[in-house]
Amino acid sequence: MNNSIFKNPSVKPFAFKFGLVKRVIVGGPYVAKPDDYFGIKMAIEIDRPCDVDIPTKDFSVPKYEDLDNGVRASLIPIAKNKPVFVGCFGGLGRTGLLMGALAKALNIPEPVLYVRANFKSHAIETDQQVKFIGNYTPSLKTKLMVSVAKAVALAY
C-alpha cells in the first residue's frame, strides 16, 4: 500500500479481520483516490473513473441492490490484498456506510460502532445511514462470495 496517500489528513485506513487474515482498505474523499487503487465511488456528484459505482446522494443511502452489489464486487480485490479505496465527497457518511455494510457482511459485531472506532469517529453521518446498516442483510450471493473471498485471502 502506498503510504504517501496518508499525507491527506482526510484519508484514513480501515483495518478488519477477513477470515483468518487482516486486511486494510482506505477511505476518504473520492477525489483523493490514487489511480492505481481499486475504486469504490459512493458519490453521485463526482465524475471520476471507478471500478464500482454506487450512486448515492450526499447524506443519503443507496439502493439496497447497488450497495449489496458493491460489497460483493469489493470482496475479491480485498481478498487478494489489492489496494482498495472507498470514497464519497467528504469521506465520512457514504464512505462509512459502505464500510459498515462490508463489516456486517463479514459478521463483525456492531458494524457502525466498529467503523467509528476503526476508521473515523464521525463516519456514517445520518440516522438514515445508521438504520440502513442495521437493516442491511447481505444477499445469498454476497454471503457466498464472502466465503469464497475468505478462502482466496488465505493464498495472498
Where are these regions (language model features)?
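Short cysteine clusters
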Residues: 88
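Ser/Thr-glycine-rich phosphate-binding loops at phosphate-binding pockets of nucleotides
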Residues: 95
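Cys-dependent protein tyrosine phosphatase-like superfamily
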Residues: 1-85, 98-156
